[in-house]
Amino acid sequence: TITDARKQVVDFSEGYYNADLLIAVKSTDNSIVKFSDLTGKKVGLKQGTAAASFMKSKYKANYIEFPNIDNAYLDLQAGNLDAVVHDSPNVLYYVKTAGNGKVKSTGETDSILPQQYGFAMQKNSSLTPKVNQALQALRADGTYDKIYVKWFAKQPK
């Protein structure tokens, strides 16, 4: 994640992914559409993350923290949780792979805790402009969109 604090230590490429938080719910659950719908629900979070801290301070739910987010997804599928909240790329990948047909993502319209991912490189690296050129070329010829859809089953934002 590109942050001002990290920029003091390393150089970043241009952002290659715009992330935020998403909600994973069972495919049959239509009661949770946005983050405010989590009130009073049993919600899984990954322990020690910015997402967990933010959610606990902003939304009143019954939170259960897991050292590994995969265990939260398993509890969701088993019916022990109403939802799991985590970073969008992870949620989208899980929905497309192990959760396919059993779990769906929601909360896209809320744009909670937006952040941008970039490649970190040594300060003043000669690679930074080359990586940026490669990212620009991938976007220009449509390759970036194809890769994104392959892994996340959605068009990039």
Predicted segments, located by residue:
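Acidic, polar ligand-binding/catalytic clefts
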Residues: T1-D37, T109-S111
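Solvent-exposed coil/turn segments that connect beta secondary-structure elements
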Residues: T1-T3, Y17, K26-D29, G48-T49, ...
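A ligand-binding cleft/hinge motif common to bilobed small-molecule-binding domains
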Residues: T1-V9, F54-S57, Q77, D82-L113
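Periplasmic-binding protein-like
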Residues: N18-V25, A51-M55, S88, L92, K96-W151, ...
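Short helix-initiation/N-cap motifs at beta->coil->alpha
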Residues: N30-S31, A50, I64-A78
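Short loop->beta-strand "edge-of-pocket" segments that line small-molecule binding or catalytic clefts
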Residues: F35-G48, A52
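Hydrophobic residues within well-ordered alpha-helices
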Residues: L38, L76-Q77, F119, V131
